[in-house]
Amino acid sequence: ERLRRAGLFKQKSQSIRGLLIWLREVGGFEVLSKIGTEELRKQLLELKGIGPETADALLLYLFDRPVFISDEYARRLFRRLGFGNFDTYNEMHAVYGNVLEALTLKQCQEIHAVIDEHGKAFGKSKGQLDECWLR
């Protein structure tokens, strides 16, 4: 269930298998709960098939860490709101990666869900909007 919420259910089975093997090798959730979020993110990024967006989704949904996911939907929304014109995940993450630390885990998950729902409902890949309330 946690892998599905993190968005990994669509990934190749080898990436999921690698993640589970790594999780077992490092001692599981209890051991990982004792290390900082940035260190855990670095370790996740070292795994085959885990990029920045997937690492942050895992942090948010699998490891229960309050992080901001700077995905394409977030970049489009922030651009439209005038909060920055970010071309890449890493550019936006450098600016907004830690803004949610003062919020609860549930609030961080809800923010990500709302941004994704907005993007699915109103966003177009060309940077235009459908019938969006932001116009």
What are these regions (language model features)?
Residues 1-135:
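Catalytic cores of DNA base-excision repair glycosylases
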